[in-house]
Amino acid sequence: VVLLFGAAVLRFHLAWWRGHLGDLLVFQSWAVGTDRMKWFREVQHLGNFFPNYPPLYPSLCRLLVWIHEAAALPGDIRLPIDDMTLEESRPIILLFKTPPIAADLAAAVIIFLWGRHERRPGLGLLVAAFYLFSPAILYDGAYYGQTDTILLALLIGSGFAYATRRPVLLGSSAMLAALLKAQAISVLPILAAAVIIEWRHVWQRRFAELFLGAALSFWAVLALAGLTGMLHLFYNGYFTIVGQYSRTSYNALNLWWIIHSPLDRRPNLADFPADSLRVAGLVTYRDIGLALFAAALALTIWRWRRAADRPASLVLACAASAWAFFNLCTEMHERYSVVAVGFTCLAALWERKWFAFGLLSSLTTMINITLACHFWYPPCRWLQFHLNWFLHADSPGPFLAISAIQVLMLPLVLDALWRTGSRGRTPAVNAR
């Protein structure tokens, strides 16, 4: 309780400051409606930023607006979040940062329960604290105000439900993850394959409960989307997102950054070509990225199928898949490695070396995120300046170094998955 309280206080303190006002304004426009916002002429361009999420999060944002209006909470919900309105908008900024903060706390509770299930309650508490104060987790949710840590919490919940044989929770949390962000594809195929692989031994007789959990979440989100007018996002959130940020890398320090970054100057977005361009007139960069991700995913599933240490190897497989998604696919944003960082930190529950690698990858991800969301922190200008050091780099060296670390996380996790040993055909974890 003390740990959760301290983590919550720190998060709300960070949330009070600027964050990414552009993304928060977009969330606000989805929730309120551009035509209902003040300064309509100044914000009508946001109509071009139609919701490109599945229905869960935009519906939740609109629900937050209704709660704010009904409860007469502080702040003008219709005043656009902007630099000029920053002081007046702080209560609204806090409002839109509350979901990721709540998700972080929930994920920590799940990690602690997972540790207790593994008969490692002390280590579970330590890993939960490690997760809560992980730089990338803190920065992406509480400061930036983005949704990646919400997705991460749902995926960790799905992994916990799988490992502890809770079919209703597994179906429910996996469905919520899919309805939150299309980027859930970074991990959900691993969990789906795991269910199929252990179908006869474990999940066949629990299919009704698994289906019930998924159905409950789906119908709840469907009802919420209908209530909030977001039903069209069942299409927009999945079928309009590919190509919207058509570059090989969109601030993501990954394999594509290394390939296309200039070596004689600081790189910028214009250096990264559209991923729809064809290589040698045959296939597009996007096709190559998807093929590489599919190959890495298939390799990970094949290896996990024979892994001996099922709880630990499942987490490593999820981490490997998430790192493959971030490093190999095109159109990646800087924060899409947050899911990979979370599972890397979680792996410390079984092997303590992941404390070091989890911290390293969390720091590189946080630094990567500052490319898009600079740290603004008036209480300590020294911290603000040094956390933004990456922005002042004139040469490509620091960018390439961080890219290399993040790319190398994939073979590192795959190697650890290989070292978990092999088993026979009998599942390592019996059904309970």
How should each PLM-predicted stretch be described?
Residues 187-216, 226-227, 339:
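Perimembrane helix-loop-helix junctions
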Residues 110-113, 134-137, 150-169, 343-344:
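Specific aromatic-rich, kink-prone transmembrane helix
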Residues 1-29, 37-46, 133, 213-230:
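Transmembrane signal-anchor helices characteristic of membrane glycosylation enzymes that use polyprenol
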Residues 116-122, 156-169, 199-201, 307-309:
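Membrane-interface transmembrane helices that cradle and orient dolichyl/undecaprenyl
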Residues 11-12, 117, 241-327:
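Aromatic/glycine/proline-enriched transmembrane-helix motif characteristic
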Residues 25-59, 63-81, 230-237:
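Extracytosolic helix-loop segments that constitute the early lumenal/periplasmic catalytic or substrate-binding loops
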Residues 223, 227-250, 302, 318, ...:
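Transmembrane helical bundles and short interhelical boundary loops of multi-pass, membrane-embedded
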Residues 83-86, 90-119, 157, 295-303:
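Transmembrane-helix motifs of polytopic, lipid-linked glycan transferases
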